[in-house]
Design a protein with these regions (language model features):
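Beta/alpha (TIM)-barrel catalytic core signal, keyed to glycine-rich beta->alpha loops juxtaposed to Asp/Glu
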Residues: 128-315, 336-337
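Structural preference for beta-strand elements that scaffold enzyme active sites
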Residues: 14-18, 50-51, 79-85, 119-122, ...
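N-terminal binding-site loop/beta-alpha segment at the start of enzyme catalytic domains
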Residues: 1-80
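Structural motif corresponding to the early beta-alpha repeats
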Residues: 74-98, 126
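Structural motif
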Residues: 43, 47, 114-115, 148
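Active-site mouth loops of central-metabolism enzymes
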Residues: 23-35, 90-105
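Short, well-ordered amphipathic alpha-helical segments that serve as non-catalytic structural scaffolds
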Residues: 40, 101-112
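Active-site groove signature of glycoside hydrolases
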Residues: 112-133
């Protein structure tokens, strides 16, 4: 039996691997039976994963309902660290950022109801809303914290400037950006000479990475010529369109060979270990919608990549992918009105 690596967020001990529930919501990744989704959450806890990350947008509330069912089935709320989000609205025209005070109050009560809990451990702004002052949003969150409805506050997809503005009003415990072998914007982009990753490390802001496996591209099951069902989010991901798809698959194949020959590991295990070994990363979120998709968790724990391996990984990615693209296509629309 392996021993899960842990860290702390706002003084609470959490697993360094967190369960991501985007796929469990049933939209964007294909349907999953509710009993299987609940079993996935419970199986994660059995493997030492106590942090579950969810959001109202995941299945339009369904993922939160699944997590709530898992909490009730387990019976001990304190065994879980529940992170959810707010700040997105949707209609027939698409998904919009909306962090107004009215929307925030509405979303908090809805999330508490769906999760069946009195308190959310980590409440995160899902995306920046350029039409609502960050200070206004942060002030309302601080009020929720004083009321005991929220324990810790976080953001997702925020720049350094936006995080600075937020924490001038309320305590900031975490940031959740996209980060994986192929998407390194928090490493590469600089604000006043500093990366988001280094800023968070210096300012004691925990990093929880989403898309750790780059929409399953690094999961070991995607292959050349693969097609995706209608409604699958990868159908609109530019990484999965030629000629980029072939370049990314070349990188995956070379990384898989490197992982196997150097460590006896899979490309999935290599990809998650790479994220965990980056300075400043607290938690790598691992998306799963079936218990068996967590089988590889044990292969990620209790080993590390050395500097030579990190350099070789960088070389493989740089040589293989000549026209990289990030996850910008996932950003919500600017709210009307």
């Amino acid at each position: 039996m392996f021993c899960m690596e842990t860290t702390t967020i706002a003084g609470v001990k959490v697993s360094r691997i967190g369960l991501g529930t985007w796929a469990i919501g049933g939209l964007d990744w294909g349907a999953v039976p509710d009993d299987v989704a609940v079993a996935t959450c419970l199986n994660a806890l059995e493997r030492g994963i106590n942090l579950i990350d969810t959001a109202p947008i995941y299945g339009h509330g369904h993922a939160e309902e699944i997590v709530g069912r898992a909490l009730r089935a387990h019976g001990r709320r304190e065994d879980f660290f529940i992170a959810t989000k707010f700040g997105l609205d949707w209609n027939e025209r698409g998904v919009f950022a909306n962090s107004t005070t009215a929307r925030l109050r509405q979303e908090l009560e809805a999330s508490l109801r769906r999760l069946g809990t009195e308190t959310i451990d980590l409440y995160q702004v899902h995306w920046p809303d350029t039409r609502t002052p960050i200070a206004e949003t942060a002030a309302q969150l601080a009020e929720f914290q004083r009321q005991g409805k929220v324990r810790a506050l976080g953001v997702s997809n925020f720049s350094i400037a936006q995080m600075e503005e937020f924490r001038a009003v309320a305590p900031l415990s975490s940031n959740q950006p996209p980060y994986n072998l192929f998407e390194r914007q928090i490493d590469d982009q600089r604000e006043h000479g500093q990366s988001i990753l280094s800023w968070c490390a210096v300012n004691n802001v925990a990093i929880l990475t989403w898309s750790t496996l780059c929409r399953s591209l690094l999961g070991g099951r995607v292959h050349r010529g693969m097609s995706f069902d209608k409604g699958d989010i990868r159908r609109v991901d530019p990484k999965f369109r030629e000629p980029r798809f072939s370049e990314y698959m070349t990188a995956v194949e070379r990384l898989a060979a490197f992982a196997r020959e150097r460590y006896g590991k899979s490309v999935l295990e290599l990809a998650v270990r790479w994220v965990l070994d980056r300075h400043g990363v607290s938690v790598a979120l691992w998306g799963a919608k079936r218990p068996d998709q967590l089988d590889a968790v044990s292969g990620v724990i209790s080993w590390q990549l050395d500097d030579a391996a990190m350099a070789e990984i960088d070389r493989i990615v740089k040589e293989s992918v000549t026209d990289p693209v990030g996850p910008e296509y996932l950003a919500p629309k600017v709210r009307e009105g």
